[in-house]
Swiss-Prot record:
<protein>
    <recommendedName>
        <fullName>Spore coat protein F</fullName>
    </recommendedName>
</protein>
<keyword id="KW-0749">Sporulation</keyword>
<dbReference type="Pfam" id="PF07875">
    <property type="entry name" value="Coat_F"/>
</dbReference>
<dbReference type="GO" id="GO:0030435">
    <property type="term" value="P:sporulation resulting in formation of a cellular spore"/>
</dbReference>
<dbReference type="InterPro" id="IPR016493">
    <property type="entry name" value="Spore_coat_CotF"/>
</dbReference>
<feature type="propeptide">
    <location>
        <begin position="1"/>
        <end position="4"/>
    </location>
</feature>
<comment type="similarity">
    <text>Belongs to the CotF family.</text>
</comment>
<dbReference type="InterPro" id="IPR012851">
    <property type="entry name" value="Spore_coat_CotF-like"/>
</dbReference>
<dbReference type="InterPro" id="IPR012347">
    <property type="entry name" value="Ferritin-like"/>
</dbReference>
Length: 160
């Protein structure tokens, strides 16, 4: 395989998903650790925070290789974070329900899970539309999408 100077579109999008998910998760971990009193659990949070920070630091150098152009940076408020976290929750719910359905043999339970899967899909669509309409998820502008990932990852890493 030859050495490429740019990432492929599909791997760029996968990287986006990982960085967006981990950035939001890191912000939540750093906010929640303040409430954790148990020393052993607090240590687990610290290990998790350090691991996610390292993951982000290792992924960020690949962003310049993504197929996009550099744009100016802009400040972000909390609404993009909160809506992004909700979108991640909805997406994970869809995946979790889909997996659970494949493991379910009881028809009544399967029907309930399918109903709940459809509700999770609807929630995902609503949150996505909200984010897109407010400019928080520029899904048709890869350059802007990746710029947001880098900004959020750096914000999460620098957060105390």
């Amino acid at each position: 395989m030859d050495e490429r100077r740019t990432l492929a579109w599909h791997e760029t999008l996968e990287m986006h998903e990982l960085v967006a998910f981990q950035s939001n998760g890191l912000i939540k971990l750093k906010k929640m650790i303040r409430e954790v009193k148990d020393p052993q659990l607090r240590q687990l949070y610290n290990v998790s925070i350090q691991g996610v920070e390292q993951n982000l630091r290792e992924l960020l150098p690949f962003f310049p290789q993504a197929p996009h152009r550099e744009d100016e940076e802009e400040e972000r408020a909390d609404n993009p974070f909160y809506s992004g976290d909700l979108l991640g929750f909805a997406k994970t719910s869809v995946r979790s329900y889909a997996i659970a359905i494949t493991e379910t043999a009881t028809p009544q339970l399967r029907n309930v899970l399918v109903k709940q899967l459809n509700a999770a899909i609807q929630l995902h669509a609503q949150v996505y539309r909200y984010m897109y309409q407010h400019g928080y998820y520029p899904s048709y502008n890869l350059s802007e999408l990746l710029k947001n990932d880098v900004r959020n990852a750096n914000r999460a890493i620098s957060m105390k």
